[in-house]
Amino acid sequence: MAASTTSRTNSRVNYSNEIHDLSTVQGGSAAAAAAALFYPDSKSIADIFPPHLGKKVISEVVATFLLVFVTCGAASIYGEDNARISQLGQSVAGGLIVTVMIYATGHISGAHMNPAVTLSFACFRHFPWIQVPFYWAAQFTGAMCAAFVLKAVLQPIAVIGTTTPSGPHWHALAIEIVVTFNMMFVTCAVATDSRAVGELAGLAVGSAVCITSIFAGPVSGGSMNPARTLAPAVASNVFTGLWIYFLGPVVGTLSGAWVYTYIRFEEAPAAAKPDTQRLSSFKLRRMQSQSALAADEFDTV
């Protein structure tokens, strides 16, 4: 019985996330802590409200607020006067704010900023299901606040950065699926695999958002995010094709996460890994650099 329990724990830990909960990776019991967090056996208060959940939720509110404020603000100004900001400028603004928020809040909450991303991480066991509702509430709250703040400060602009199809709905749906697939594929690579780019993770994801939104913008608006679409739609009372921006990102993120999970190399069992392999790629690279520097100083002495 004990052997089977250990086997189940090890198989679960293989799928645990390496970036979204750094508090579980310290010390020799990292594997057991990760298993307890991601697959709790009981529904105690500690399971439902794990340590630092409130800080993670606030982090998601702030990150999503700033994401929507920048992207919808740029889109609003472009829609009112395209001489002041171009389509390319919108795409660059979107990519940059994603990059900045990943570096600012990635070590706290994972910087999801997107309900579809949270759903996909949970489906592929990189994020605990029990925290998904809290993240969704935070993301939609941050997005709504940003949209209504923009509506107040950008008067008399009536349409606050809404995303609507410019042609047939299936064209917009196809574009949203493809561009969100691209974003999630890159995100899975840099957020769940410690062998990926590490310190450049934020730049990689931001670049993916920027590049794909350049050509997706004229067709669908390049949303890639249900919260980013719903909030300005409510603030502007414009709901044209709203279903596209829920279905497209969900299909795109799930398929992107599945493809990366399928093609990535299998790693050694978690029990055989040193504890440093449980760390996020961000933190692991820093620790390796510090260790190398310390070794050089020791050799010098």
Curated annotation (Swiss-Prot):
Report how it sits in the membrane: Multi-pass membrane protein
**Which ranges does the record mark as transmembrane?**
57-77, 91-111, 132-154, 172-192, 200-220, 238-258
A GO cellular component annotated for this chain's UniProt record is:
membrane
What positions carry the motif NPA 1? 114-116
Keywords from UniProt, A to Z, are:
Membrane, Repeat, Transmembrane, Transmembrane helix, Transport
Q: Which SUPFAM superfamilies match?
A: Aquaporin-like
In chain numbering, where does the motif NPA 2 fall?
A: 225-227
Superkingdom as given in the UniProt entry: Eukaryota
Tell me where it resides: Membrane
| Main location class | membrane
GO MF annotations, alphabetized: channel activity
User: What does this chain do?
Assistant: Aquaporins facilitate the transport of water and small neutral solutes across cell membranes.
Q: Which family does it belong to?
A: Belongs to the MIP/aquaporin (TC 1.A.8) family. NIP (TC 1.A.8.12) subfamily.
* Domain note: Aquaporins contain two tandem repeats each containing three membrane-spanning domains and a pore-forming loop with the signature motif Asn-Pro-Ala (NPA).
Q: What is this protein called?
A: Aquaporin NIP2-3
